[in-house]
Swiss-Prot record:
SUPFAM superfamilies: VC0467-like. One of its GO terms (cellular component) is cytosol. This is UPF0301 protein VP2612. InterPro entries: AlgH-like (IPR003774). It holds the Pfam family DUF179. It comes from Vibrio parahaemolyticus serotype O3:K6 (strain RIMD 2210633). It comes from the Bacteria. Belongs to the UPF0301 (AlgH) family.
């Protein structure tokens, strides 16, 4: 089982309050563990304010200031000072991994200098920190019914309001969210 390019959708009975109601985009999953970014946990800072704090200068005039008003997200509890940009591929950046034809993850500062300019990706999400699992840990959490899994779609990441992402991911599985129980069971 490889959950790269899938969403982890927290079940109502999620024991860890940090991840309650979370939707996590899985960037990497292999025998060594897994790494992902929460896509529905905004923090109290905009992309524009973050760029000012880290003193990133644009490579082109910033013509699209409105795009900088979007929130920065809490990607997870690990390396919270490290940034990850989930975006639609447009250009090559120093440290990018193309996940699909429609989605890439970049960790290098060069992408920050194009945000708000004509060169920015058409859609993007900036996250600080990431969520990580050691070998076998995520698989154990799946057995414990902590997560639902579903193939990721850019529409849920970029086109769905933040407060609706959990619900939309559950509905994409064909499940009525009101029918999910916090009690785990095994048949």
């Amino acid at each position: 089982m490889n959950l790269t390019n899938h969403f982890l959708v927290a079940m109502p009975g999620m024991k860890d309050p940090y991840f309650q109601n979370s939707v996590i985009y899985v960037c990497e999953h292999n025998e060594e563990g897994a790494m992902g970014l929460m896509i529905n946990a905004p923090v109290d800072i905009t992309v524009g304010n973050m760029l000012k704090q880290v003193d990133v200068q644009p490579v082109h005039p910033r013509l699209f200031e409105a795009s900088l008003d979007r929130p920065v997200y809490n990607g997870g509890p690990i390396s919270e000072d490290r940034g990850f940009i989930l975006h639609k591929p447009k250009d090559y950046y120093e440290s990018s991994i193309q996940m699909t034809d429609d989605l890439a993850v970049t960790t290098s500062r060069d992408i920050l200098s194009v945000l708000g300019t004509e060169a920015e990706p058409s859609d993007y999400l900036v996250a600080l920190g990431y969520s990580g699992w050691s070998a076998g840990q995520l698989e154990n959490e799946l057995v414990e019914n902590s997560w639902l899994t579903i193939e990721a779609t850019p529409e849920i990441i970029f086109d769905t309001p933040i407060t609706e992402r959990w619900k939309k991911a559950v509905e994409k599985l064909g499940i009525d969210p009101s029918q999910l129980s916090a009690d785990a069971g095994h048949a």
